[in-house]
Amino acid sequence: MEYTDNPRKILGRVDVIYSDTEISKDIQTTESGNSAISHPDEVFGAYLVPTVKGCTMDGNATMDGSFQMMDDSVVLGWWSGSLSGSSGVFANAPWIEISFVKRPIISWVVLGDEKRNEYPVDFILQYKRDGKIVHSDSVTVNNQIQVRLTPQLEDITSIRLTITKWSKPNACAKILKFYDRMMERYEGDAIEMFEVSEEMGAADGNYNIVSDTMTVNIFNKDRKFDKGYLRSLMILDRKLLPSIGIETDGEVKYQPLGTFYSDEWQINQDSQWVKCSAVDRLMRLQKKTYVGFPLTENASLYDIAADILLNIGETADTFVISNDLKSVIVPMAFLPKGTAWDALQEIANAGLCKVFVNREDKINVRSEKEPKTTTAIRIDKSNMFSYSSSVSLTEFANRISVEYCDVSLSDDTVEAVSVELNIEPNASLELTLDYNTEVAYPAMETDNLNVLLTDFQGGVNACSVVAKNKTAQKQKAVLMVTGKAIEITTKSLTMQDDDSVRNNGVTEYSHPSSDLVQSHAQAEYIARILLERMHAGEGVITTTWRGNPKLNLGEKYESEDRFGDSQELVCEYNKFTFDGGLKQETRGRTI
């Protein structure tokens, strides 16, 4: 069965992850002891296999070439400080305890070292509620690397693992994982409906950053959300993963629709349904501070975008940036301190980019030049409920104005900020200082040689630094940041469609300014693209149809109206509504 079939059987489901290593920032561990190299915080990570087969000097490693030396860069989990005896029994049983906010424990995992084939043989798990043991699980004669226990407990705040016997003699305990996420899947009668909206650009056609949303109504079985085991987890940032599926030859193939984080829970005692509203992770960027991009000559928009994302904790595998932005060079690039959201909006304005999160939960910075995949999806009167075409005032213009700037530096060094500190004996202060003026190439100095300045990161309007008192006496110090003053001269370029102006009069659009547009060529490119897009008659087509979740943002599809006229569109917006069946609203822009 395909999504184009009629009739068809559509299924929907929503996985809600109430606790995992990403969204649970409160997790802590305590241990009886640690080996010289030990990473107890890794036991609640997502690791299933150590980085290396660690070489040890306890007689349990050989020179066969399979063992490797270790350092703190490897993933290995918790290695205890005590060794087992000749029979594997510990004279002093090592333990590790993990604590967290109150949560139910449906299942729990204990994972040893797969590469070394080592694991706990005899061990005890103690489940605690506010420090008091409420349940224990004792395991003996275990011979498995991984053990999953299912205690089914409520309101647990910590769990202790005590190991009395190990699988190898004269060896420390090696626990890679001591954690399990809390996840429930809702499908069938457990879901009344859900709605997912994904968008790569606003309807007005501006280049900007857009956050996706979803809502779901879940059956409050046995009142578990307000009176049962989930009541303590009705908090923000729980992870939701909606999917749409279709049954083919007795097998359901699901299409994930993204990852969202709970923004609001509505639990009405007069209703059997709980409503959850959620947003994608882009919304978090409004609360994340980006220290800024220091003035750098000939930096590309690609490098600046990557710097923003890496500095707020993203990694190279959690975002995608259009490669053509590497060729957009900014002669004197800089960004001031601000939110990561605002910084990415600057990239969008300067490079004509859409910033959004795709269904793989990756942040996309996609330029207008990004190649668009063609699909076989077609919307016509056979699968369409409604069709509308719109060209708003914000989507039509025949004269485009784009600002660009020249950036230069003063010859003189100026003071950006000066601050007086009192630092306690042997203490360190982590400081973030806002400047009084924007400067390039900032440098910091102090009038007190007993104060050590480290980890200085200087931007154009703010900096961060660690100031350490090297003495046993209280110290007073003045910190001063100096640099070259930044001077900006703004220019404007105007481009128009002469024929349209003669026929229709002038309708002008001014593109949002950005200090990252610093060349006439880039301003001309922006104006030309905008003029092409804002021709009369080139608006957006919005259709409501039977739907196919295989249509992704940025992909091309064919749309035919009720009069038989067809055109190729680029998908910029989808809204999926599942209530036992599927309905989809799609907005596409003419190419």
Question: Where are the predicted features?
Answer:
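Loop/turn positions that initiate beta-strands
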Residues: 237, 552-554
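Solvent-exposed, polar/charged alpha-helical surfaces in well-ordered, non-transmembrane soluble domains
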Residues: 283, 303-307, 341-349
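Soluble non-cytosolic domains of exported or imported proteins
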Residues: 295-303, 334-342
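Assembly/oligomerization scaffold segments
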Residues: 1-295, 332-334, 346-352, 413-482, ...
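N-terminal export/assembly leaders
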Residues: 305-335
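C-terminal, non-catalytic macromolecule-binding modules
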Residues: 474-507
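Short beta-strand/loop turn elements enriched in aromatics
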Residues: 190-215, 314, 402, 503-536
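Extended amphipathic alpha-helical segments with heptad-repeat/coiled-coil character used for oligomerization
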Residues: 349-374
